[in-house]
Design a protein with these regions (language model features):
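Acetyl-CoA-dependent GNAT
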Residues: 8-77, 81-83, 100-106, 136-139
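Conserved acetyl-CoA pyrophosphate-binding loop and the N-cap/start of the following alpha-helix
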Residues: 84, 88-96
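Conserved N-terminal entry element of GNAT/NAT acetyltransferase domains
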Residues: 1-12, 149-150
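Active-site acidic-Proline motif in GNAT/NAT acetyltransferases
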Residues: 81-87, 118-119
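Conserved beta-strand-loop-alpha-helix junction that forms the acyl-donor binding cleft
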Residues: 108-124, 140-143, 150
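Short, well-ordered alpha-helices that flank and scaffold nucleotide-derived cofactor binding pockets
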Residues: 95, 99, 103, 129
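Active-site beta-strand termini and strand-to-loop segments that position acidic
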Residues: 53-55, 147-150
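Conserved active-site alpha-helix within GNAT-family acetyltransferase domains
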Residues: 91, 118-135
Length: 150
C-alpha cells in the first residue's frame, strides 16, 4: 500500500486545504474543500474532515460524516490534488478512511455510502474495486454507492 496518513483538519492545517487543486474538468465531480470545511463546521458533532498526507505534504482531502437518522457513515468530498493523482494515493486514502469508519467513531454502523458521478470513471472504478456497489438510489446526477464493512 502507498504510504499516506490521514490527519484531522484543524486550525493548524485548514489553510493548506485551500491550495489543493483538481485536474482539468474535475471540478464538476467534487466540491473544493472550502465548501466541505464549512459543512464540517456545521456538522462538527458528527463528522471528521481529514487531510491526506504524503510525508508532511498535504496531497488530498476527505470527510467522514455520520448520519444519526439513517445510522450510516458517509464519505464526502474525496479528492486528491492533481499533482498526486494516478499514484495510488486515492486508494490508500480510502482504505485508511474505511479503517477509521470500522472503529465506529460516531455510531455503531457497518454501512458506508458515498455518491459518485458515473462519468467520473477513475473514482467510480476505485470505489467498485474497494467493494462498493450501487444502492439503486441517486442524488441529483450522482449514483449512491454503498459498502457493508465486515
Amino acid at each position: 500500500m502507498v504510504d499516506i496518513t490521514l490527519r484531522p483538519i484543524d486550525e493548524s492545517n485548514f489553510i493548506d486545504c485551500f491550495n489543493l487543486q483538481l485536474g482539468d474538468g474535475q471540478d464538476k465531480f467534487v466540491s473544493h474543500p472550502i465548501r466541505s470545511l464549512a459543512q464540517a463546521y456545521v456538522y462538527r458533532d458528527q463528522c471528521q474532515p481529514f487531510g491526506v498526507y504524503v510525508g508532511d505534504t498535504l496531497a488530498g482531502y476527505v470527510m467522514v460524516i455520520y448520519d444519526y437518522d439513517e445510522e450510516t457513515y458517509n464519505i464526502w468530498h474525496m479528492m486528491i490534488d492533481k499533482a498526486y493523482q494516478g499514484r495510488g494515493y486515492g486508494k490508500a486514502a480510502m482504505q485508511r478512511v474505511l479503517s477509521y469508519i470500522a472503529s465506529k467513531p460516531f455510531g455503531n454502523s457497518n454501512h458506508v455510502s458515498l455518491t459518485c458521478a458515473p462519468d467520473n470513471k477513475a473514482a467510480y472504478g476505485l470505489y467498485k474495486r474497494l467493494g462498493f456497489n450501487e444502492s439503486g438510489r441517486s442524488d441529483e446526477d450522482e449514483v449512491e454507492l454503498e459498502l457493508y464493512l465486515k
